[in-house]
């Protein structure tokens, strides 16, 4: 295989040759009249309709002239004719070029096009004998010459860091990834439509703030040179939205970036997209209905169903994770290759291409299950051979390492073949204290039946010694934080179907109103789906005196932490209101079957390369 530098040099030489002929391979403009996938689908629809109704006018007929543009993703040289696959965001189409049609000079240029080049094509549609919708090239224009080769399917996509750091390569090679981000865009568009239809006004509030507020989080700090003072990137949208409620904007929402200078995890990114919405004269009950209606609508729009599956492996993910290495091809120890060559050869034949014709229409779960069966069989044959005392292998031998690798592949394939069904039709409501009490009683095997009736000191002891949460409870944790650790570690991960957890401890949400029936709690909900919080919401505190007392207590006497302008705004009078926040990234993770927040953010934060 040629190294990358050699391939780059070859492409640069082709560029120089084109320019020497007076060809400019970096055009300013080209105007296609339709997409590649659109042209292919339309011709296919015409062809299929003609089989049953010769008079049908559905689609584009053979012989229709079209102009398309896209990236070359496949190139097959047949001598005096060339077949290329051209692809854009709408899909792909096969294009066919003949020396007889283009002439010697143009055909020679066409033959030297490279994978990943952008070209514009004019020609006529036709169906091949094999029934493949195609375009016969009559004229072509090089629009953008690629000076680097595309990544090899197995090598370029197997490196997760390359996928995140060079997302453009991921999008070029992986249709599943592109689909995720197109659907994310559709989700955000549907959210906006939902709120506009309900009479909400979309607003924009400051990203740089003199005092970060609305959440307990570490902010990023920046300096405003002209004003000569520090500013903070916002950690929440809330306080400016409440100013707008004071100003008479009764229904408002914003979709924007928040920034928190905290840790990275599969669920956390320092820069994330947040939706916040507020409705005057509503409360937390009002906002629960809003969240449920919104999520159902978006799910039906983006996924087409109220049932969502997790995790959702894609064909590309299966190819990347396993591919040709699923059975250790190229590194099988000699003894195993000789002894089990037949089984390995047959198995590889089943696994060469997950997206080949035999697997083309299968669901990813079915592909994983099929691969699991194949690899399990090979492992079983080898294991039976060893168990029969036919042969033994030394510890650390290549043979044992290979067998251990097979066992790991079997286990991962088994996980990929499992479905977790999230039913968005069923929404529950559970009180926070009830959930915690029941879980503690269950885990302690009845030793602690009434968590909230024992002393704070005893709660800490039980959490550490009985519930085994010592690693999650810091020495300085207050009592409500100890209970919070119990909820986050033992309860939240079990809430798969949508669950509104209500009446949280008042210390957790200082900007919410107290519950009339239990003054130790607030009128708050956390909407949990698939084991993580998707949306908090609550009845907003509109009493300026009560709000000042809570915020002063929270600030601990540090006056600079108080947002006096916000408190003054409340003193001008704010209507009762309900508010919600929904993490767009987590919502997309849930709806699109992604296990990491980085898989729904185009360019997630990574440590810069040195």
What are these regions (language model features)?
Residues 3, 12-21, 27-286, 294-296, ...:
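Class II aminoacyl-tRNA synthetase-like tRNA-binding/catalytic domains
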Residues 42-52, 300-305, 438-445:
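Short regulatory "switch" loops immediately downstream of catalytic or recognition motifs
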Residues 197-202, 300-309:
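Surface-exposed helix-capping loop/turn segments at secondary-structure junctions
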Residues 206-299, 309-419, 426-610:
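A translation/RNA-centric and nucleic-acid-associated enzymatic feature enriched
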